[in-house]
Amino acid sequence: MEHTLPALPYAMDALAPHISRETLEYHYGKHHQTYVTKLNNLIKGTEFENATLEEIVKKSSGGIFNNSAQVWNHTFYWNGMKPDGGGVPTGALADGINKKWGSFEDFKKAFSASCVGNFGSGWTWLVKKADGSLDIVNTSNAATPLSGADKPLLTCDVWEHAYYIDYRNARAKYVESFWGLVNWDFVAKNYA
């Protein structure tokens, strides 16, 4: 099965001023597209040729895993943001956050510190553990909770290509701006 670049759930300039159109043109239009193209080339003639993206992520390794996971991670990241996002979660998700961190502000500080402290290229995730509790997990490179027992709820891409055009080497400024985009409805649906 040929995998395609999923459409963004908003216009290329819709995340400005937090994330510029130029960043999306490179990050989505070039980086994400390249992962899709490489994945399609790598799976030809393999057991993964007709597999779904999630099946490939869960069962593959090496280059096939790296590219499939990056396609999945990026799609998840785009869906976790929206124009005029931000604010605070409500309902069961807010309760889960308060149970683990005491308050949304304390969660936000912990998640931001994890993003900024995630060495090198990778992802910072809010995940739901098997016991229903929440946690913050850092992964390196293409690694994703999808291939393990944790259920991903939200992610922040901390690869430099996610923020370098807009924020240069100021990852902390990018992370602070990310909070103005979070799509809490998407996160809550993942939590349910």
Model feature map: region roles:
Residues 1-192:
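Feature for soluble, non-membrane regions of globular proteins
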